[in-house]
Structure formats: structure tokens, C-alpha cells
Regions:
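Active-site glycine/GP-rich loop and adjacent strand/helix microenvironment
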Residues: 1-206
Length: 206
């Protein structure tokens, strides 16, 4: 699935609505309907929700109708946000508001009481949408709870740094978190044999 940052970029470039498939190495899991809402294919999978908070959950799926690779309570690494209102398409299958990101890519920072709190990838994407006109690509790498490297590809590098710092200041303040050291570096072209991950947590924060 695309991040909101990438979806907006593609929709603007092609002047079309973007519809998506939700799948992983285990196969097809769902797709967006005509209204753009992602639905889990519960005709093929039995879905259990491992709740993280009141709106986010980790999907645990079971599929016994698969002979080659049956899945029994397979815990995925994705974090989904449940859609609170019924979708206009009328489907009874679970509707997902958005994908917050992957568990392994959730960033953690200390709060004022020193407890580590999560910052999900979608929070970061939403904060940086403001600078999407100048920033063409970015990547965040967390080396520790006090150090965050921000790689950016931008039309105006210095202006992008200033805008991103302002957005991060708002983000950490709204979450009641201590602001880490931000290190900005130009983003180099990614080798074609590497998978691009926009958010990476290299430190063992949890």
C-alpha cells in the first residue's frame, strides 16, 4: 500500500483517483472499493484484531482453504486503523481507514516522564505533507531515541530543512515528546537491488 504522501503525489501527477491492492508475501488480503476505502477480504480470511489502542490494531489472519500454504493465526507486521463509520459501498467486510505503517518501523521517543512513546509512520507522513511541494523524497532513520537522521531530496535543500524542523517541532510537542537531534543529509539514489523503506528504526528502543 502507498503512503498518503506517495498516493497524493501519484494522484496529482496523473490527475486520477488511486485505487490500491493490499497484499504481502502470503498473497492477496484486500483492496479499495469504488469509494477508495480499503476492505479486508474476509471471504478468504478469518480476521482477528490485536488492539494496540482504541483505533489501531495488528491483523492476525487465518486461511484454512489454502492447501499449499495454510495460515493459522498469522500475525502480520502491519498496523491498521479501523474505519469508525460504515463505508458507503455497503460492504460488511472490515473497512480500514489507513495503514499506520509497520510495527518494525514505528519510531519511539521519550516523553517528559522518560517513558518511550510510539510515533507511527502515518503521523510523520501527515506532518510532512505540508512540505511535499518542495520535498520530492525523504527517508527517516532512527539510530537512537535521541538521534534521527533525515534524508531528503528537495528543490531547495535549506528551505526544506527549515520547514521540516518546524513540522517536527509541532509533531513532538503535540505528542508530549522530547525532540531528538535531527541530522539532515541529502538523499542519494537508492540501488535498484535494495527495498526502499521510508521509515527505519535501527535502535532497539522497545
Amino acid at each position: 500500500m502507498l503512503t498518503s504522501f506517495d498516493e497524493s503525489y501519484i494522484a496529482t501527477a496523473f490527475k486520477q483517483n488511486v485505487h490500491q491492492l493490499y497484499q504481502c508475501a502470503e498473497g492477496w488480503l484486500g483492496a479499495t472499493c469504488e469509494y477508495g476505502t480499503l476492505h479486508i477480504d474476509e471471504e478468504q480470511y478469518f480476521l482477528e484484531k490485536e488492539w494496540i489502542d482504541k483505533e489501531r490494531f495488528i491483523p492476525v489472519i487465518t486461511a484454512l482453504n489454502r492447501y499449499v500454504q495454510p495460515l493459522v493465526r498469522y500475525r502480520m507486521d502491519d498496523i491498521l486503523v479501523l474505519k469508525t463509520k460504515p463505508c458507503l459501498c455497503g460492504s460488511a467486510m472490515t473497512a480500514v481507514e489507513k495503514i499506520s505503517g509497520r510495527c518494525e518501523d514505528t519510531l519511539y521517543f521519550p516523553s517528559k516522564d522518560q517513558a518511550l512513546r510510539p510515533v507511527y509512520a502515518d503521523h510523520i507522513h501527515q506532518a510532512l505533507r505540508v512540505v511535499s511541494g518542495n520535498v520530492h523524497q525523504y527517508q527517516l532513520i532512527q539510530y537512537s531515541v535521541h538521534r534521527l537522521v533525515v534524508k531528503i531530496q528537495a528543490s531547495n535543500f535549506l528551505q526544506a530543512i527549515e520547514c521540516i524542523e518546524q513540522q517536527f517541532e509541532k509533531l513532538f510537542f503535540s505528542h508530549g515528546l522530547k525532540r531528538p537531534l535531527l541530522e539532515f543529509v541529502p538523499m542519494e539514489a537508492l540501488p535498484l537491488n535494495q527495498t526502499f523503506r521510508r521509515t527505519q528504526r535501527l535502535s532497539k528502543c522497545t
